[in-house]
Protein backbone atom coordinates (compact mmCIF):
# COMPACT_ATOMS: atom_id res chain seq x y z
CA UNK A 1 0.00 0.00 0.00
CA UNK A 2 2.80 2.42 0.95
CA UNK A 3 4.62 1.62 -2.31
CA UNK A 4 1.52 2.53 -4.28
CA UNK A 5 1.18 5.82 -2.42
CA UNK A 6 4.84 6.66 -3.07
CA UNK A 7 4.44 5.82 -6.76
CA UNK A 8 1.33 7.99 -7.03
CA UNK A 9 3.14 10.90 -5.34
CA UNK A 10 6.15 10.54 -7.64
CA UNK A 11 3.98 10.37 -10.76
CA UNK A 12 1.91 13.33 -9.61
CA UNK A 13 5.08 15.36 -8.97
CA UNK A 14 6.53 14.38 -12.35
CA UNK A 15 3.44 15.34 -14.32
CA UNK A 16 2.97 18.49 -12.28
CA UNK A 17 6.54 19.60 -12.98
CA UNK A 18 6.12 18.73 -16.65
CA UNK A 19 2.89 20.69 -16.83
CA UNK A 20 4.51 23.66 -15.13
CA UNK A 21 7.51 23.41 -17.48
CA UNK A 22 5.25 23.31 -20.53
CA UNK A 23 3.29 26.28 -19.27
CA UNK A 24 6.52 28.24 -18.68
CA UNK A 25 7.87 27.29 -22.10
CA UNK A 26 4.66 28.38 -23.81
CA UNK A 27 4.77 31.67 -21.94
CA UNK A 28 8.44 32.19 -22.81
CA UNK A 29 7.83 31.40 -26.49
CA UNK A 30 5.03 33.94 -26.78
CA UNK A 31 7.10 36.64 -25.11
CA UNK A 32 10.22 35.93 -27.16
CA UNK A 33 8.28 35.92 -30.43
CA UNK A 34 6.83 39.33 -29.60
CA UNK A 35 10.24 40.64 -28.52
CA UNK A 36 12.08 39.68 -31.70
CA UNK A 37 9.30 40.91 -33.99
CA UNK A 38 9.61 44.32 -32.38
CA UNK A 39 13.42 44.26 -32.15
CA UNK A 40 14.97 47.07 -34.18
CA UNK A 41 18.14 49.12 -34.16
CA UNK A 42 17.44 52.79 -34.75
CA UNK A 43 20.38 53.41 -37.11
CA UNK A 44 20.35 50.08 -38.95
CA UNK A 45 17.87 48.74 -41.50
CA UNK A 46 18.16 44.93 -41.44
CA UNK A 47 14.57 43.84 -41.91
CA UNK A 48 12.24 42.06 -39.48
CA UNK A 49 13.78 39.66 -37.01
CA UNK A 50 11.99 36.61 -35.60
CA UNK A 51 12.41 33.80 -33.09
CA UNK A 52 13.44 30.53 -34.74
CA UNK A 53 13.47 28.33 -31.64
CA UNK A 54 14.54 28.13 -28.03
CA UNK A 55 15.37 25.53 -25.42
CA UNK A 56 15.22 25.70 -21.62
CA UNK A 57 17.51 23.45 -19.60
CA UNK A 58 15.85 23.49 -16.18
CA UNK A 59 18.56 21.35 -14.60
CA UNK A 60 21.47 23.59 -15.69
CA UNK A 61 19.29 26.69 -15.45
CA UNK A 62 20.13 27.86 -18.97
CA UNK A 63 18.05 29.24 -21.82
CA UNK A 64 19.26 28.83 -25.41
CA UNK A 65 17.55 31.27 -27.79
CA UNK A 66 17.93 30.95 -31.57
CA UNK A 67 16.97 34.05 -33.54
CA UNK A 68 16.65 34.38 -37.31
CA UNK A 69 19.64 35.45 -39.38
CA UNK A 70 18.37 39.04 -39.49
CA UNK A 71 19.81 39.48 -35.99
CA UNK A 72 23.27 38.68 -37.39
CA UNK A 73 22.84 41.37 -40.07
CA UNK A 74 23.19 44.15 -37.50
CA UNK A 75 26.40 45.32 -35.77
CA UNK A 76 26.93 44.01 -32.25
CA UNK A 77 28.87 45.82 -29.55
CA UNK A 78 29.44 45.01 -25.86
CA UNK A 79 26.87 47.62 -24.84
CA UNK A 80 24.22 46.48 -27.31
CA UNK A 81 24.74 42.82 -26.36
CA UNK A 82 24.38 43.61 -22.65
CA UNK A 83 21.28 45.66 -23.40
CA UNK A 84 19.70 42.86 -25.45
CA UNK A 85 20.24 40.32 -22.69
CA UNK A 86 18.93 42.77 -20.10
CA UNK A 87 15.72 43.39 -22.06
CA UNK A 88 15.15 39.67 -22.62
CA UNK A 89 15.61 38.97 -18.92
CA UNK A 90 13.07 41.66 -18.04
CA UNK A 91 10.34 40.05 -20.13
CA UNK A 92 10.95 36.44 -19.00
CA UNK A 93 8.66 35.02 -16.31
CA UNK A 94 9.94 33.66 -13.05
CA UNK A 95 11.85 31.59 -12.24
CA UNK A 96 13.59 31.40 -15.66
CA UNK A 97 14.38 35.12 -15.64
CA UNK A 98 17.26 34.20 -13.33
CA UNK A 99 18.62 31.55 -15.71
CA UNK A 100 21.76 32.10 -17.80
CA UNK A 101 20.82 33.21 -21.31
CA UNK A 102 22.59 32.61 -24.63
CA UNK A 103 21.27 34.17 -27.85
CA UNK A 104 22.37 32.57 -31.13
CA UNK A 105 22.03 33.84 -34.69
CA UNK A 106 23.65 32.48 -37.81
CA UNK A 107 25.34 29.73 -35.78
CA UNK A 108 27.12 32.12 -33.40
CA UNK A 109 26.28 33.75 -30.11
CA UNK A 110 25.79 37.48 -30.45
CA UNK A 111 28.89 38.02 -28.29
CA UNK A 112 30.97 36.22 -30.91
CA UNK A 113 29.78 38.69 -33.56
CA UNK A 114 31.48 41.62 -31.84
CA UNK A 115 34.56 42.54 -33.93
CA UNK A 116 37.85 42.25 -32.05
CA UNK A 117 38.48 45.97 -32.38
CA UNK A 118 35.37 46.80 -30.33
CA UNK A 119 35.78 44.15 -27.63
CA UNK A 120 36.57 45.23 -24.10
CA UNK A 121 37.73 41.83 -22.90
CA UNK A 122 39.10 38.68 -24.46
CA UNK A 123 39.87 38.76 -28.18
CA UNK A 124 39.11 35.95 -30.61
CA UNK A 125 42.63 34.86 -31.59
CA UNK A 126 41.30 32.63 -34.36
CA UNK A 127 40.44 35.77 -36.32
CA UNK A 128 43.62 37.72 -35.53
CA UNK A 129 46.87 37.69 -37.52
CA UNK A 130 49.24 38.41 -34.63
CA UNK A 131 51.15 35.22 -35.49
CA UNK A 132 51.04 35.97 -39.23
CA UNK A 133 53.34 38.92 -39.66
CA UNK A 134 55.19 39.21 -42.96
CA UNK A 135 58.82 39.95 -42.11
CA UNK A 136 60.19 40.18 -45.62
CA UNK A 137 60.76 43.21 -47.82
CA UNK A 138 57.63 44.81 -49.30
CA UNK A 139 56.93 44.23 -52.98
CA UNK A 140 57.59 47.89 -53.84
CA UNK A 141 59.07 50.60 -51.60
CA UNK A 142 59.20 54.27 -52.57
CA UNK A 143 62.66 55.25 -51.35
CA UNK A 144 62.23 58.89 -52.38
CA UNK A 145 59.41 59.45 -49.89
CA UNK A 146 60.57 62.43 -47.77
CA UNK A 147 59.40 60.82 -44.53
CA UNK A 148 59.18 57.39 -42.94
CA UNK A 149 55.87 55.78 -42.02
CA UNK A 150 55.83 53.90 -38.74
CA UNK A 151 52.21 53.66 -37.58
CA UNK A 152 50.34 53.39 -40.84
CA UNK A 153 50.11 50.64 -43.46
CA UNK A 154 53.82 50.34 -44.14
CA UNK A 155 54.76 46.88 -45.38
CA UNK A 156 51.13 45.84 -45.86
CA UNK A 157 49.75 44.46 -49.12
CA UNK A 158 46.10 45.17 -49.88
CA UNK A 159 43.81 44.32 -52.80
CA UNK A 160 40.90 46.63 -53.59
CA UNK A 161 38.85 46.92 -56.73
CA UNK A 162 35.97 48.67 -58.39
CA UNK A 163 33.13 46.61 -59.78
CA UNK A 164 32.49 45.21 -63.25
CA UNK A 165 33.73 46.86 -66.48
CA UNK A 166 33.05 46.39 -70.18
CA UNK A 167 32.89 42.71 -71.13
CA UNK A 168 32.22 40.44 -74.07
CA UNK A 169 28.65 39.10 -74.10
CA UNK A 170 29.21 35.60 -75.46
CA UNK A 171 25.65 34.76 -76.49
CA UNK A 172 25.21 38.08 -78.30
CA UNK A 173 28.69 38.32 -79.84
CA UNK A 174 29.17 41.91 -78.73
CA UNK A 175 30.74 44.00 -75.96
CA UNK A 176 28.58 45.65 -73.33
CA UNK A 177 28.43 47.13 -69.85
CA UNK A 178 27.59 44.77 -67.01
CA UNK A 179 25.17 47.24 -65.41
CA UNK A 180 22.54 49.64 -66.88
CA UNK A 181 23.05 53.33 -67.61
CA UNK A 182 21.44 55.42 -64.86
CA UNK A 183 21.90 59.00 -63.65
CA UNK A 184 24.61 59.83 -66.23
CA UNK A 185 26.76 56.79 -65.44
CA UNK A 186 26.83 53.02 -65.05
CA UNK A 187 28.16 51.05 -62.09
CA UNK A 188 31.05 49.87 -64.29
CA UNK A 189 32.25 53.50 -64.37
CA UNK A 190 30.82 54.92 -61.16
CA UNK A 191 32.70 52.88 -58.55
CA UNK A 192 36.01 53.67 -60.27
CA UNK A 193 35.50 57.31 -59.33
CA UNK A 194 35.93 56.34 -55.67
CA UNK A 195 38.65 53.70 -55.93
CA UNK A 196 41.17 55.17 -58.38
CA UNK A 197 41.43 58.89 -57.49
CA UNK A 198 40.65 58.63 -53.77
CA UNK A 199 41.00 55.31 -51.95
CA UNK A 200 44.10 53.87 -53.64
CA UNK A 201 46.22 57.05 -53.23
CA UNK A 202 45.15 57.31 -49.57
CA UNK A 203 46.23 53.72 -48.89
CA UNK A 204 49.51 54.21 -50.75
CA UNK A 205 50.24 57.45 -48.93
CA UNK A 206 49.82 55.47 -45.71
CA UNK A 207 52.55 53.10 -46.90
CA UNK A 208 50.56 50.21 -48.37
CA UNK A 209 51.24 48.24 -51.53
CA UNK A 210 47.89 48.28 -53.34
CA UNK A 211 46.82 45.96 -56.14
CA UNK A 212 43.70 46.29 -58.25
CA UNK A 213 42.83 43.65 -60.87
CA UNK A 214 41.40 46.18 -63.33
CA UNK A 215 43.69 48.64 -65.09
CA UNK A 216 44.16 51.67 -62.83
CA UNK A 217 45.63 54.16 -65.31
CA UNK A 218 43.16 56.30 -67.28
CA UNK A 219 45.85 57.21 -69.82
CA UNK A 220 44.71 56.02 -73.27
CA UNK A 221 48.25 55.98 -74.65
CA UNK A 222 50.62 53.10 -73.99
CA UNK A 223 54.33 52.71 -74.71
CA UNK A 224 56.19 49.47 -74.07
CA UNK A 225 59.98 49.40 -74.02
CA UNK A 226 61.47 45.92 -74.03
CA UNK A 227 64.78 44.14 -74.32
CA UNK A 228 63.24 42.12 -77.17
CA UNK A 229 62.54 45.25 -79.19
CA UNK A 230 59.33 47.19 -79.76
CA UNK A 231 56.42 46.30 -81.99
CA UNK A 232 55.96 48.81 -84.80
CA UNK A 233 53.02 50.97 -83.83
CA UNK A 234 51.78 54.54 -83.95
CA UNK A 235 53.34 55.33 -80.59
CA UNK A 236 56.66 54.35 -79.14
CA UNK A 237 58.54 53.94 -82.45
CA UNK A 238 61.54 55.87 -81.16
CA UNK A 239 61.74 54.06 -77.83
CA UNK A 240 64.83 52.05 -77.01
CA UNK A 241 66.30 49.69 -74.43
CA UNK A 242 69.95 50.03 -73.38
CA UNK A 243 72.31 47.90 -71.28
CA UNK A 244 75.56 49.05 -69.71
CA UNK A 245 77.87 46.44 -68.20
CA UNK A 246 80.61 46.77 -65.63
CA UNK A 247 83.89 44.95 -65.24
CA UNK A 248 82.33 42.44 -62.86
CA UNK A 249 78.76 42.33 -64.12
CA UNK A 250 77.74 41.33 -67.64
CA UNK A 251 74.14 41.24 -68.83
CA UNK A 252 72.88 37.87 -70.09
CA UNK A 253 69.65 36.08 -70.95
CA UNK A 254 67.86 34.30 -68.11
CA UNK A 255 67.10 31.38 -70.40
CA UNK A 256 63.43 31.50 -69.37
CA UNK A 257 60.44 33.00 -71.23
CA UNK A 258 59.77 36.68 -70.65
CA UNK A 259 57.57 39.43 -72.03
CA UNK A 260 57.46 40.42 -75.69
CA UNK A 261 54.78 42.23 -77.65
CA UNK A 262 54.56 40.27 -80.89
CA UNK A 263 51.16 41.47 -82.10
CA UNK A 264 48.71 44.35 -81.86
CA UNK A 265 45.69 42.26 -80.90
CA UNK A 266 45.65 39.20 -78.63
CA UNK A 267 43.22 36.30 -78.80
CA UNK A 268 41.86 34.30 -75.89
CA UNK A 269 44.68 32.27 -74.32
CA UNK A 270 47.57 34.28 -75.77
CA UNK A 271 50.23 34.98 -73.15
CA UNK A 272 52.59 37.90 -73.92
CA UNK A 273 54.73 37.04 -70.89
CA UNK A 274 55.77 33.80 -72.59
CA UNK A 275 56.65 35.32 -75.97
CA UNK A 276 60.01 36.91 -75.18
CA UNK A 277 63.12 36.83 -73.03
CA UNK A 278 64.47 38.60 -69.97
CA UNK A 279 67.94 39.73 -68.93
CA UNK A 280 69.90 39.54 -65.69
CA UNK A 281 73.21 40.58 -64.17
CA UNK A 282 75.03 40.16 -60.86
CA UNK A 283 74.65 42.77 -58.16
CA UNK A 284 77.38 45.03 -56.79
CA UNK A 285 77.54 47.17 -53.66
CA UNK A 286 79.03 50.20 -55.42
CA UNK A 287 76.93 52.77 -57.26
CA UNK A 288 76.89 53.49 -60.99
CA UNK A 289 78.11 50.13 -62.17
CA UNK A 290 75.95 48.03 -64.51
CA UNK A 291 72.46 49.21 -65.37
CA UNK A 292 69.59 48.80 -67.82
CA UNK A 293 67.72 51.75 -69.28
CA UNK A 294 64.26 52.03 -70.83
CA UNK A 295 63.68 55.25 -72.79
CA UNK A 296 60.13 55.72 -74.11
CA UNK A 297 59.04 57.79 -77.08
CA UNK A 298 55.99 59.37 -75.43
CA UNK A 299 53.22 60.12 -77.99
CA UNK A 300 51.54 62.88 -75.98
CA UNK A 301 52.51 64.94 -72.93
CA UNK A 302 50.60 63.75 -69.88
CA UNK A 303 50.51 61.49 -66.86
CA UNK A 304 51.53 57.86 -67.37
CA UNK A 305 51.54 54.96 -64.95
CA UNK A 306 54.90 53.16 -64.93
CA UNK A 307 54.95 49.37 -64.70
CA UNK A 308 58.08 47.23 -64.63
CA UNK A 309 58.46 43.49 -65.12
CA UNK A 310 61.08 40.89 -64.26
CA UNK A 311 61.46 37.21 -63.49
CA UNK A 312 61.90 35.58 -60.09
CA UNK A 313 65.23 33.78 -60.06
CA UNK A 314 66.72 31.52 -57.36
CA UNK A 315 69.15 34.25 -56.27
CA UNK A 316 67.03 37.35 -56.96
CA UNK A 317 67.55 40.23 -54.53
CA UNK A 318 64.87 41.98 -52.50
CA UNK A 319 66.21 45.50 -53.11
CA UNK A 320 66.40 45.96 -56.89
CA UNK A 321 66.92 49.69 -57.42
CA UNK A 322 64.74 51.45 -60.00
CA UNK A 323 64.96 55.14 -60.89
CA UNK A 324 62.10 56.87 -62.71
CA UNK A 325 63.14 60.08 -64.49
CA UNK A 326 60.12 62.31 -65.15
CA UNK A 327 59.10 65.97 -65.36
CA UNK A 328 59.06 66.32 -61.59
CA UNK A 329 62.58 64.98 -61.08
CA UNK A 330 63.81 61.51 -60.20
CA UNK A 331 61.91 59.06 -58.01
CA UNK A 332 63.70 56.03 -56.58
CA UNK A 333 62.08 52.68 -55.82
CA UNK A 334 63.19 49.42 -54.27
CA UNK A 335 61.49 46.34 -55.73
CA UNK A 336 61.58 42.91 -54.13
CA UNK A 337 62.37 40.71 -57.14
CA UNK A 338 62.04 37.56 -55.06
CA UNK A 339 58.26 37.86 -55.39
CA UNK A 340 55.78 39.02 -58.02
CA UNK A 341 57.72 38.12 -61.18
CA UNK A 342 56.24 37.59 -64.63
CA UNK A 343 53.61 40.34 -64.44
CA UNK A 344 53.27 44.12 -64.49
CA UNK A 345 54.44 45.73 -61.24
CA UNK A 346 53.13 49.24 -60.64
CA UNK A 347 55.65 51.83 -59.44
CA UNK A 348 53.74 55.10 -59.71
CA UNK A 349 52.16 57.65 -62.04
CA UNK A 350 54.30 60.49 -63.39
CA UNK A 351 54.20 63.30 -65.94
CA UNK A 352 56.25 62.79 -69.12
CA UNK A 353 56.81 65.17 -72.02
CA UNK A 354 56.05 64.21 -75.58
CA UNK A 355 58.87 62.54 -77.46
CA UNK A 356 62.12 61.00 -76.27
CA UNK A 357 63.90 62.90 -73.52
CA UNK A 358 66.90 62.51 -71.23
CA UNK A 359 64.57 63.26 -68.32
CA UNK A 360 62.01 60.64 -69.33
CA UNK A 361 63.17 57.08 -68.68
CA UNK A 362 63.41 54.19 -66.22
CA UNK A 363 66.76 52.87 -65.01
CA UNK A 364 67.48 49.60 -63.18
CA UNK A 365 70.80 49.58 -61.34
CA UNK A 366 72.67 46.49 -60.22
CA UNK A 367 73.53 48.26 -56.96
CA UNK A 368 72.36 46.16 -54.02
CA UNK A 369 73.19 45.38 -50.41
CA UNK A 370 72.58 41.72 -51.21
CA UNK A 371 74.64 39.26 -53.23
CA UNK A 372 72.56 37.95 -56.09
CA UNK A 373 71.07 39.12 -59.39
CA UNK A 374 68.70 41.74 -60.72
CA UNK A 375 66.44 40.95 -63.66
CA UNK A 376 65.25 43.27 -66.45
CA UNK A 377 62.26 42.73 -68.72
CA UNK A 378 59.74 45.10 -70.30
CA UNK A 379 58.63 48.45 -68.89
CA UNK A 380 55.18 49.82 -69.67
CA UNK A 381 54.15 53.49 -69.70
CA UNK A 382 50.40 54.22 -69.64
CA UNK A 383 47.21 52.22 -69.36
CA UNK A 384 46.55 51.98 -73.08
CA UNK A 385 43.64 50.72 -75.12
CA UNK A 386 42.07 47.30 -74.74
CA UNK A 387 43.88 44.81 -76.96
CA UNK A 388 42.14 41.53 -76.13
CA UNK A 389 39.87 40.39 -78.96
CA UNK A 390 36.72 38.43 -78.18
CA UNK A 391 34.53 37.23 -80.99
CA UNK A 392 36.96 38.80 -83.45
CA UNK A 393 36.74 42.31 -82.00
CA UNK A 394 38.20 44.38 -79.19
CA UNK A 395 36.10 46.60 -76.93
CA UNK A 396 37.36 49.76 -78.64
CA UNK A 397 37.77 51.37 -75.21
CA UNK A 398 40.69 52.30 -72.96
CA UNK A 399 41.83 49.31 -70.92
CA UNK A 400 40.75 50.87 -67.61
CA UNK A 401 37.10 50.67 -68.73
CA UNK A 402 37.29 46.92 -69.37
CA UNK A 403 36.68 44.12 -66.89
CA UNK A 404 39.43 42.41 -64.92
CA UNK A 405 39.42 39.35 -67.18
CA UNK A 406 41.16 41.23 -69.97
CA UNK A 407 43.65 43.10 -67.78
CA UNK A 408 44.58 39.75 -66.23
CA UNK A 409 45.48 38.28 -69.62
CA UNK A 410 47.60 41.31 -70.51
CA UNK A 411 49.27 41.01 -67.09
CA UNK A 412 50.46 37.47 -67.78
CA UNK A 413 48.06 35.59 -65.52
CA UNK A 414 47.65 31.84 -66.21
CA UNK A 415 44.63 30.87 -68.30
CA UNK A 416 43.05 29.18 -65.29
CA UNK A 417 43.01 32.51 -63.44
CA UNK A 418 40.99 34.49 -66.00
CA UNK A 419 39.20 31.82 -68.05
CA UNK A 420 37.75 29.17 -65.77
CA UNK A 421 34.86 28.81 -68.22
CA UNK A 422 37.27 28.29 -71.14
CA UNK A 423 36.20 31.41 -73.01
CA UNK A 424 32.48 30.54 -72.99
CA UNK A 425 31.23 32.82 -70.20
CA UNK A 426 33.15 36.08 -69.90
CA UNK A 427 30.90 37.69 -67.30
CA UNK A 428 31.36 34.80 -64.85
CA UNK A 429 35.06 34.69 -65.61
CA UNK A 430 35.38 38.41 -65.00
CA UNK A 431 33.75 38.15 -61.58
CA UNK A 432 36.00 35.24 -60.57
CA UNK A 433 39.15 36.75 -62.06
CA UNK A 434 39.25 39.54 -59.47
CA UNK A 435 39.65 37.10 -56.60
CA UNK A 436 41.77 34.57 -58.47
CA UNK A 437 44.34 37.20 -59.42
CA UNK A 438 44.78 38.00 -55.73
CA UNK A 439 45.09 34.30 -54.88
CA UNK A 440 47.68 33.73 -57.60
CA UNK A 441 49.73 36.76 -56.63
CA UNK A 442 49.56 35.77 -52.94
CA UNK A 443 50.16 32.06 -53.57
CA UNK A 444 53.04 30.72 -51.49
CA UNK A 445 53.01 33.67 -49.09
CA UNK A 446 52.17 33.41 -45.39
CA UNK A 447 48.62 34.56 -46.17
CA UNK A 448 48.02 31.92 -48.87
CA UNK A 449 50.42 29.08 -48.09
CA UNK A 450 48.42 26.28 -49.72
CA UNK A 451 48.37 27.62 -53.30
CA UNK A 452 51.16 28.10 -55.79
CA UNK A 453 51.76 31.63 -56.97
CA UNK A 454 54.02 34.66 -56.89
CA UNK A 455 54.46 35.00 -53.12
CA UNK A 456 53.14 38.55 -52.65
CA UNK A 457 51.71 38.72 -49.09
CA UNK A 458 48.25 40.17 -49.71
CA UNK A 459 46.23 39.91 -46.51
CA UNK A 460 42.80 41.33 -47.39
CA UNK A 461 40.58 42.31 -50.29
CA UNK A 462 37.68 44.71 -50.64
CA UNK A 463 35.34 45.08 -53.62
CA UNK A 464 33.41 48.34 -53.95
CA UNK A 465 30.06 48.05 -55.71
CA UNK A 466 26.91 50.10 -56.02
CA UNK A 467 23.52 48.45 -55.66
CA UNK A 468 20.02 48.66 -57.12
CA UNK A 469 16.88 49.76 -55.29
CA UNK A 470 14.52 52.73 -55.28
CA UNK A 471 12.85 54.77 -52.54
CA UNK A 472 9.73 56.55 -53.79
CA UNK A 473 9.94 59.19 -51.06
CA UNK A 474 13.55 60.14 -51.87
CA UNK A 475 14.95 58.42 -48.82
CA UNK A 476 18.48 57.00 -49.04
CA UNK A 477 18.95 53.29 -49.78
CA UNK A 478 22.42 53.28 -48.23
CA UNK A 479 25.21 50.75 -47.62
CA UNK A 480 25.14 46.95 -47.60
CA UNK A 481 28.02 44.67 -46.55
CA UNK A 482 28.67 41.09 -47.71
CA UNK A 483 31.04 38.39 -46.45
CA UNK A 484 31.22 34.57 -46.65
CA UNK A 485 32.01 32.10 -43.87
CA UNK A 486 30.47 28.86 -45.20
CA UNK A 487 33.41 27.81 -47.34
CA UNK A 488 36.59 25.76 -46.81
CA UNK A 489 35.26 24.52 -43.46
CA UNK A 490 34.88 28.08 -42.26
CA UNK A 491 38.59 28.81 -42.58
CA UNK A 492 40.90 30.95 -44.68
CA UNK A 493 43.85 29.13 -46.24
CA UNK A 494 45.95 30.18 -43.23
CA UNK A 495 43.61 28.22 -40.97
CA UNK A 496 42.23 31.42 -39.49
CA UNK A 497 38.49 31.85 -38.95
CA UNK A 498 36.62 33.32 -41.93
CA UNK A 499 34.72 35.50 -39.47
CA UNK A 500 37.71 37.83 -39.83
CA UNK A 501 35.87 38.90 -42.99
CA UNK A 502 32.83 39.86 -40.94
CA UNK A 503 35.03 41.98 -38.69
CA UNK A 504 36.36 43.74 -41.80
CA UNK A 505 32.85 44.30 -43.17
CA UNK A 506 31.57 45.67 -39.86
CA UNK A 507 34.48 48.10 -39.42
CA UNK A 508 34.07 49.42 -42.97
CA UNK A 509 30.33 49.96 -42.63
CA UNK A 510 30.68 51.52 -39.20
CA UNK A 511 33.24 54.05 -40.42
CA UNK A 512 31.21 54.88 -43.53
CA UNK A 513 28.06 55.43 -41.49
CA UNK A 514 29.86 57.62 -38.94
CA UNK A 515 31.75 59.80 -41.41
CA UNK A 516 28.88 60.34 -43.86
CA UNK A 517 26.37 61.15 -41.12
CA UNK A 518 28.80 63.47 -39.34
CA UNK A 519 30.00 65.29 -42.46
CA UNK A 520 26.68 65.82 -44.24
CA UNK A 521 24.24 65.79 -41.30
CA UNK A 522 22.00 63.23 -42.98
CA UNK A 523 20.46 59.95 -41.87
CA UNK A 524 22.67 57.76 -44.00
CA UNK A 525 21.17 54.27 -44.02
CA UNK A 526 23.23 51.38 -42.77
CA UNK A 527 21.78 48.20 -44.20
CA UNK A 528 22.54 44.56 -43.45
CA UNK A 529 25.75 42.59 -43.28
CA UNK A 530 24.98 39.47 -45.30
CA UNK A 531 26.80 36.20 -44.74
CA UNK A 532 26.18 34.84 -48.23
CA UNK A 533 27.80 32.99 -51.08
CA UNK A 534 29.27 35.63 -53.42
CA UNK A 535 32.30 34.95 -55.61
CA UNK A 536 34.24 38.01 -54.46
CA UNK A 537 33.87 37.01 -50.80
CA UNK A 538 34.04 33.23 -51.23
CA UNK A 539 37.01 32.75 -53.55
CA UNK A 540 39.68 35.00 -51.99
CA UNK A 541 42.15 33.10 -49.83
CA UNK A 542 42.32 36.15 -47.56
CA UNK A 543 39.78 38.06 -45.47
CA UNK A 544 37.42 39.72 -47.95
CA UNK A 545 34.25 41.75 -48.20
CA UNK A 546 31.97 43.50 -50.67
CA UNK A 547 30.78 47.02 -49.88
CA UNK A 548 27.59 47.92 -51.75
CA UNK A 549 28.03 51.63 -51.11
CA UNK A 550 24.71 53.05 -52.31
CA UNK A 551 21.99 52.57 -54.89
CA UNK A 552 22.90 53.74 -58.39
CA UNK A 553 19.16 53.53 -59.12
CA UNK A 554 17.99 55.93 -56.39
CA UNK A 555 18.04 59.71 -56.86
CA UNK A 556 18.83 60.60 -53.23
CA UNK A 557 21.86 58.30 -53.21
CA UNK A 558 23.20 59.49 -56.56
CA UNK A 559 22.67 63.15 -55.67
CA UNK A 560 25.45 62.60 -53.15
CA UNK A 561 27.29 59.99 -55.19
CA UNK A 562 28.29 62.43 -57.94
CA UNK A 563 29.65 65.01 -55.45
CA UNK A 564 33.50 64.97 -55.37
CA UNK A 565 33.40 65.95 -51.70
CA UNK A 566 31.29 62.88 -50.97
CA UNK A 567 33.72 60.70 -52.92
CA UNK A 568 36.57 62.07 -50.79
CA UNK A 569 34.63 61.39 -47.58
CA UNK A 570 33.89 57.82 -48.66
CA UNK A 571 37.48 57.21 -49.76
CA UNK A 572 38.85 58.51 -46.46
CA UNK A 573 36.34 56.48 -44.44
CA UNK A 574 37.31 53.30 -46.28
CA UNK A 575 41.02 54.07 -45.79
CA UNK A 576 40.53 54.66 -42.05
CA UNK A 577 38.53 51.46 -41.67
CA UNK A 578 41.18 49.39 -43.47
CA UNK A 579 43.87 51.01 -41.31
CA UNK A 580 41.91 50.12 -38.16
CA UNK A 581 41.25 46.56 -39.30
CA UNK A 582 44.83 45.70 -40.29
CA UNK A 583 46.34 47.38 -37.24
CA UNK A 584 43.99 45.43 -34.97
CA UNK A 585 44.73 42.18 -36.78
CA UNK A 586 48.43 42.58 -35.98
CA UNK A 587 48.07 44.18 -32.55
CA UNK A 588 49.63 47.45 -33.71
CA UNK A 589 48.95 51.07 -32.85
CA UNK A 590 48.01 53.40 -35.70
CA UNK A 591 47.72 57.07 -36.61
CA UNK A 592 45.30 58.41 -39.21
CA UNK A 593 46.88 60.63 -41.85
CA UNK A 594 46.06 64.33 -41.44
CA UNK A 595 43.82 66.04 -43.96
CA UNK A 596 45.44 67.79 -46.93
CA UNK A 597 46.55 71.36 -46.27
CA UNK A 598 44.53 74.33 -47.54
CA UNK A 599 45.27 77.91 -48.62
CA UNK A 600 48.43 76.82 -50.41
CA UNK A 601 50.18 79.79 -52.04
CA UNK A 602 53.48 80.79 -53.63
CA UNK A 603 54.87 84.29 -53.02
CA UNK A 604 58.00 86.10 -54.09
CA UNK A 605 60.45 86.00 -51.20
CA UNK A 606 62.01 88.96 -49.43
CA UNK A 607 65.40 87.98 -50.77
CA UNK A 608 66.25 88.20 -54.44
CA UNK A 609 65.43 85.17 -56.60
CA UNK A 610 63.53 83.37 -53.84
CA UNK A 611 60.00 82.07 -53.47
CA UNK A 612 58.05 81.42 -50.29
CA UNK A 613 55.49 78.66 -49.89
CA UNK A 614 52.65 79.01 -47.40
CA UNK A 615 49.69 76.90 -46.34
CA UNK A 616 47.30 76.18 -43.51
CA UNK A 617 46.82 72.90 -41.72
CA UNK A 618 43.33 71.42 -41.58
CA UNK A 619 41.79 70.08 -38.40
CA UNK A 620 39.88 66.84 -38.82
CA UNK A 621 36.61 67.10 -36.86
CA UNK A 622 36.01 63.36 -37.33
CA UNK A 623 39.19 62.31 -35.55
Predicted regions and their residues:
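N-proximal, solvent-exposed amphipathic alpha-helical segments enriched in charged/polar residues
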Residues: 22-60, 136
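Active-site microenvironments of hydrolase-like enzyme catalytic domains
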Residues: 161, 401-498, 530-553
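Active-site-adjacent mobile loop/cap segments within catalytic or ligand-binding domains
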Residues: 277, 367, 378-386, 463-488, ...
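A short beta-strand element within beta-rich, extracytoplasmic domains
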Residues: 278-280, 290-314
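Short, surface-exposed beta-strand/strand-loop-strand elements in extracellular ectodomains
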Residues: 312-331
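Extracellular carbohydrate recognition and processing domains
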Residues: 327-357
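Pro/Thr/Ser/Gly-rich low-complexity, intrinsically disordered linker/stalk tracts
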Residues: 581-622
